């Protein structure tokens, strides 16, 4: 019996020696840190994040924002708030001293609106490339530099391959953009992780032709981005915010369709006000009510037995005028983030957009 135990220990020690030899050989060949034990350095497990500018969305994402060193996809219909959400993330990154870049493939960035959202234009790197290849090459160079914290590419649909630009107007080039994206993401994904750069791809929605069952909606650029993205956000405009007869903002719903760093399928709603961006005060009222921090009785809202307004808009205005109370409510909401996360859990289900072959025919939404 003891003989078997001794031989087992011997086998284990031989296995350990063989493993140590293999690890040292890998480190000699590919450099120190190319392979390591996951639990040895706990900082490796920690995922750094950048706030989205929305308190509710930060809670829904599970790590306090969008993860750094990962690929993010934000998609939705036109005028749903995709670029606004990306610019708010850029503004939050700049507040903490981050370097941000914006690859404007659509040639549609409004610098005045970006400034209103809090983006420091003097520190923002911007590129307006002519072709999809040029845009992705610029993105690759910026990521490899290791000096950029957040890189936004707006949008995947506007990354037109050079062959398509040089061809005739009616030429059929199926799958060309999908192949371009697939090759670029294979090249980018390793350097994104090493440089700890967050790359946000903004994408548009198309309708698949001839779909009888399920949603006909899909995103442009093939399937590669769906696989490589660690977080996918589906953003929709669900209503208008009016001041008397004038529309002053949009009610917006964001669903976390995919999340590799925390449980997915949570969804949040917030207001995007024109010329202001995501309404922080509106979120404090809504999330505070869900967590029981802000009491609601009829149409009246109150905090610590003090009435703060009749109706949601009046409560928002009261918090704008009383920043100390707003800060107190925000701190209480952050302390109860786990409870709120449970309340905003959506019904689990698969991604609504079906798989898209490289050569699928697409029609504009």
From Swiss-Prot:
Annotated spans, Disordered: 346-365
GO MF annotation, one: damaged DNA binding
InterPro entries reported in the protein's UniProt record: AAA+_ATPase (IPR003593), DNA_recomb/repair_RecA (IPR013765), DNA_recomb/repair_RecA_CS (IPR020584), P-loop_NTPase (IPR027417), RecA-like_C (IPR049261), RecA-like_N (IPR049428), RecA_ATP-bd (IPR020588), RecA_C_sf (IPR023400)
Residues annotated as binding ATP: 76-83
Recorded GO CC terms: cytosol
Keyword Transport: no
Transmembrane segments: none
CDD domains attached to this UniProt entry: RecA (cd00983)
Domain of life assignment: Bacteria
Amino acid composition bias (Acidic residues), ranges on this chain: 353-365
Protein family: Belongs to the RecA family.
Protein name per its UniProtKB record: Protein RecA
Record organism: Parvibaculum lavamentivorans (strain DS-1 / DSM 13023 / NCIMB 13966)
